[in-house]
Design a protein with these regions (language model features):
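Glycine-rich phosphate-binding loop and adjoining helix at the ATP-binding site
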Residues: 1-61, 189-199
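Short secondary-structure boundary segments
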Residues: 5, 67-69, 118, 181-182
Length: 241
């Protein structure tokens, strides 16, 4: 069993989750006893980059940005998944973009996640339109109709994604950046807008692509973790080089 969690994972143990409390609960042992099988717990963005890697065998340095209810970053550096000393590497959603900004469940103010996540952007759209309920399909439909509030939300997505990628480039210098988000899945041309917004001369060789796997990238990453352990191998690709 492989579980993808929105939070910090270290050695199959949950250290921090921003929107629910699991840090005091040994979920791995509980599921192991319940189902009598090995259990792997990993950050969902890390699973996402492993899923993407399975179809991109020619890259050794990949940054995969997952934008859903939060914002996560999976990093594959020099051929290895990078999680840092205690699993906190890749928590790009909790880097600060406004020191006096919105409160975040992590305890800080102005975290990127509070401006870039689909949850945050849909909340902004709901407040701007005074609608009782919104979802991404509604936002998408109104964007296609050139609704000014929907356009403003898409512009904010491009703005904060540009900030996010600029920071990633300067910190990790990946070969390729993959964006896994409903925005870029349904509107892949947004990646070109983001590229045009990256003004630094350091970014000339960068490749930015929308994920072709979307939600299945996490699933495929989970499969990769379990199969590699079962076969006792270090590398697994779903396509040939």
């Amino acid at each position: 069993i492989t579980l993808g969690i929105h939070g910090v994972i270290h050695n199959d143990q949950i250290s921090f989750t921003p929107y629910y409390s699991l840090s005091e609960f040994d979920l791995s042992s509980f599921l192991n006893q319940r189902f009598n099988t090995k259990v792997f717990i990993e950050n969902e963005a890390n699973l996402s980059v492993l899923g993407e890697l399975s179809y991109m065998p020619n890259y050794k340095n990949i940054a995969s940005i997952s934008v859903h209810s939060g914002v996560g970053l999976g990093l594959f550096i020099n051929g290895d998944l990078y999680t840092g000393f205690s699993g906190y590497a890749g928590e790009i959603g909790h880097t600060i973009v406004d020191v006096d900004g919105r409160d975040c469940p992590c305890g800080n103010k102005g975290c990127l996640e509070q401006y870039l996540s689909e949850k945050a952007l849909l909340k902004e759209f709901k407040e701007a339109t005074n609608l009782d309920y919104v979802d991404f399909d509604m936002l998408s439909s109104m964007y296609k109709l050139a609704n000014k509030d929907a356009i403003a939300i898409f512009q904010k997505f491009v703005k904060y994604m540009t900030v996010c990628i600029n920071n990633i480039l300067n910190l990790y210098n990946p070969d390729i950046v993959i964006i896994n988000s409903s925005f870029t899945h349904h509107f892949p041309e947004l990646t070109k807008d983001i590229e045009h917004s990256l003004n630094s001369r350091l970014n000339d060789v960068l490749h930015i692509y929308p994920s072709k796997l979307h939600h299945t990238s996490i699933l495929l990453g989970g499969v990769s973790v379990a199969v590699k352990d079962f076969l006792d191998i270090n590398d697994l690709r779903f396509v040939s080089k």
